[in-house]
UniProtKB/Swiss-Prot annotation:
Gene3D superfamilies assigned to the protein according to its UniProt record, in alphabetical order: Fumarase/aspartase (Central domain), Fumarase/aspartase (N-terminal domain)
InterPro entries registered for this protein in UniProt: Aromatic_Lyase, Fumarase/histidase_N, HutH, L-Aspartase-like, Phe/His_NH3-lyase_AS
5-imidazolinone (Ala-Gly) cross-link, renumbered residues: 143-145
A GO term for molecular function: histidine ammonia-lyase activity
Name of this chain's protein: Histidine ammonia-lyase
Enzyme class label: lyase
Catalysis: reaction(s): L-histidine = trans-urocanate + NH4(+)
Amino acid sequence: MKQLTIYPGKLTLDELRQVYLQPVKITLDSQIFPAIERSVECVNAILAENRTAYGINTGFGLLASTRIEEDNLEKLQRSLVVSHAAGVGKALDDNMTRLIMVLKINSLSRGYSGIRLAVIQALIALVNAEIYPHIPCKGSVGASGDLAPLAHMSLLLLGEGQARYQGEWLPAKEALAKANLQPITLAAKEGLALLNGTQVSTAFALRGLFEAEDLLAAAIVCGSLSVEAALGSRKPFDARVHVVRGQQGQIDVAALYRHVLEESSELSDSHINCPKVQDPYSLRCQPQVMGACLTQLRHAADVILTEANAVSDNPLVFAEQGEVISGGNFHAEPVAMASDNLALVLAEIGALSERRIALLMDSHMSQLPPFLVENGGVNSGFMIAQVTAAALASENKALAHPASVDSLPTSANQEDHVSMAPAAGRRLWEMAENTRGILAIEWLSACQGIDFRNGLKSSPILEEARVILRAKVDYYDQDRFFAPDIDAAVKLLAEQHLSSLLPSGQILQRKNNR
């Protein structure tokens, strides 16, 4: 099992991707322990001095003015967790649940939440034992924290609800017992600290970010294959074109296209003296469009990584000053807007890919047989595959509508503006699936087109991309059941067979090579 030491507030995107992809063994940097203890001491001092502080000895939301007596404080925290566990929908998978839990551990360990180290260690023990709480995927509006899903996460600590252990859903107490763990009792402030926060919104956005990064890389390879299949020019990828514009994302993407295409190939040499002056935009403007996508991807990554390391609790405990301050760090507007940007990225990757597919189908544009098949008429070839790509691209356009501009007041108008960040992040998963389907069809189409070019070879990287596909999907000499071939290409894309052809870490890394 992968080992990960959490230095609170310093998680990297690579570490978060590892957490998402596979189980991890968590340890917490012991240097943060004193800060955690000081925040608890501050909470205890407020109680000892009989001061009123929101979330410590008051009700919540519109009931914040209700003072809670000391003998009810433990009950208050338990009641908060069980009452707020009101989510609906399918349970999140282990990968998403683990990522949420690690994000919560990271945030609580910063030492501003007034929660005991023992509670944080109890969460760590769950991650290390691979016991995952039942968290429904819907029920948060991304303001006042992701209350419902984080309440479902916290139920497991109390021995309530359900948990998945070794692939089986069990009552929480039974799952804990199988791993030799015990339920805990929450002290003042601790239930609220567990529930308040943007960790679910951030985890949803992180998955979308990881998907978008992989798909952008795959799109560069697919787009390069289409350039070769359509006998397109390499000149639009010349570094000089992009340097004079100065858009860094465009500069960096053009460099990746040049890396994939190389200076020339047998295919490019075959039409070096052709009369064609300019290629259609879907071929020629790939660096401009994909470069803009990369710029948005990088911005979203910066925002989401900042939030992954943020303290998004409320109220916050500033132990050195002995103060507890109510604020609004639980409002996930930055994450919602970042997710909206990622939605644009995914929609545009798919939209441009679909246009290249359509170009390859059109014999007047590509100089290839209509619908990429011999004996057209008897055979329909890729005709309906392009229709499928168009359907997916169109669906993504609807899904790309910004969620962050929506808001519905909650909690009797106390929480009168919300971010809708969870919905903004969750729809990215469906958009990524759609975009992967479009790219799969382009991969199939471009390889079929190259197969019509009299055995001429492309660049080494693109030849490898063809070999990978042809190991699973044969050349189309006549019509056959098409869907399994798309599924095979989708599976190869999901396994990162194309994105891995680019140099490691080259998508989000900035070059500064103007």
